Amino acid sequence: MPFHLPKSCLIVFCNLLSFHIVAQPNEHQSALIFEKRQIASESFESVNVLDIDKDGVLDIFSGSFWYKGPDYIRRNYVGPISRHGEYYDDFSTIVFDVNGDGNKDVITGGWFGGVLVWKENPGKEGNWKEHIVARCGNIETTRSWDIDGDGVVEIVPNTPGKPLVIYKLRKGQTNDVVKFDSIKVMDQHGHGLGYGDINGDGRGDLIVDKGWLECPDAPFSKPWVLHPDFDLVQASVPMLVTDVNQDGLNDVIIGQGHNYGLNWYEQQVDKKKNRTWIKHSIDPYNAQFHTMMMSDIDNDGALELITGKRYRAHDDNDPGAHDPVGLYYFKWNGESFSKQIISYGPPGEGKGTGIFFAIEDLNNDKWKDIVVAGKDGLCVFFNKGVAR
């Protein structure tokens, strides 16, 4: 006799099947294998990689310490960072030889102190001297982009409720005195910041919570025009500008930094040059997508989206704060993003991204590795390549 499932069973079965499909590679891709290695248990939320001692090997810098490569066991103290509740006041790790002495320095800043600083690499073991770049107000996090195309990055902190300011290293300085010029491009902006060419004129624009700021032909002397295309709340830093569907128009990928959701906004331009945006969901089921990167981590020539949860971004106060912690990469399959899980589980088992992370080939095996900090510790996910 025919067998009929109750409707409730059908619903459960279909839901499980859908999740299974989303988590698997499509027919044109194979999953990557990652080996997780715990580096430290401190709860600094930012990390980057650089060759600190100029021995040709990449080291890891996070918070008050740097870890010597290639094994990252030996660590060196950099200096103190103030702590406020669960937070260390250290929300970026931008690598930049600020004073031109050949040693890679680090730029950071924090919410509580409201100060953008650069930490001077002594070139050897010992404390890194801290220099003030600007007192700019509460810093959510900071990013760097080469806005004028001169080969030197500018520094752009996200300071919600405060002016949006670009900090440019002043040229022709000696090592003893280093100053940054400040260029205000907006009187006030909110949570979220991105950079990329929206209108196809070859210049990078700034993306903020209320729209995008069009870069003029003289970015440090002419006004930036706001196009109020968006109305975002607690958007990610960065918001990524990339041509997702390869139609010749750049789109924007935006995470919800303190809520559920990861989306991409498809740019469309009609014959009258009117610009509209169509919102597409990438992952509506996870929360606190505070930071993200694009990188080719499977060596197929196409960029993947790498992101995950900023664990305890607002302590216990965000939607999804008590959900499992995850790190993922998403691959465009021609129609949508396919999700691959790198790490997922309860705190201590799953691992998130923190607020600033790095992707580099640490062990010279031609596969890019992922280095993530956070309130759930400092880890490296060594990329072992495609599963066979």
Predicted regions and their residues:
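Beta-propeller-forming repeat regions
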Residues: 23-388
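Bacterial Sec-dependent N-terminal signal peptides
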Residues: 1-26
